[in-house]
From Swiss-Prot:
It catalyses: a ubiquinone + NADH + 5 H(+)(in) = a ubiquinol + NAD(+) + 4 H(+)(out). It is a multi-pass membrane protein. This is NADH-ubiquinone oxidoreductase chain 3. It comes from Petromyzon marinus (Sea lamprey). It is found in: Mitochondrion membrane.
Amino acid sequence: MNSFMVMIMLTLTLSSIMALLAFWLPIMKPDSEKLSPYECGFDPQGSARLPFSLRFFLVAILFLLFDLEIALLLPSPWATNISNPEFTLLWASLFVLLLTLGLIYEWLQGGLDWAE
């Protein structure tokens, strides 16, 4: 066995042992101090569980998807230096088309409307 395989096996074994120990050994004793939110030493003013807008979450996820699209398409001008640049153009166009169809679907389903 080469040293790389030994290192991989050792890493997997140690991480598995530590994960199992962390799962089996914790002693959980909940009390009022642990269950209350921490507010810089002051008594809590209200509930720590605030309502969350699912529409905002959807728009944030869509922003992340389209931000990822830009990050994936930025290197495409350098990819045209390969032997077949038409292949790169085809994949980039299919990628943009797929994301555009997803955006149109979200728009038609009303996922981007703020008012109901």
